[in-house]
């Protein structure tokens, strides 16, 4: 019996490709509470969005920060427009934030 055996890298690359091709996971709006927010010296912002049922890791690259008119902080309720993708090296998925529009109310859009 012949078995297909794949490397970790092959599996992660395949999963990344599946995420990229899934139209539901591209340009998706996700709402949640900002958690674990860290501004990196590179200009990127690393954070998580959470709600009562789960959490997703997020990244906003420095080049995407132009439209962000407020400083993200722990506990803010936000809506993020982005693409769900994978970080192949670690085999983890994350939300890659694309655009940011803020509102003056407690609910902000990023």
Predicted feature locations:
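Single conserved hydrophobic/aromatic residue that forms the stacking wall/gate
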Residues: 99-110
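A beta-strand/beta-hairpin structural motif
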Residues: 58-64
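OB-fold (S1/OB) nucleic-acid-binding surfaces
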Residues: 45-58
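Short nucleic-acid-contacting surface segments enriched for D/E, G, S/T with interspersed K/R
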Residues: 65-79
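OB-fold and OB-like beta-barrel modules that bind single-stranded nucleic acids
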Residues: 28-34, 75-86
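Short boundary/loop segments of OB/S1/cold-shock single-stranded nucleic-acid-binding domains
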Residues: 7-26
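Conserved positions in beta-strands of structured domains
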Residues: 35-38, 50, 61, 85
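Short, Lys/Arg- and Gly-enriched loop/turn segments at beta-strand edges
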Residues: 44-45, 86-95
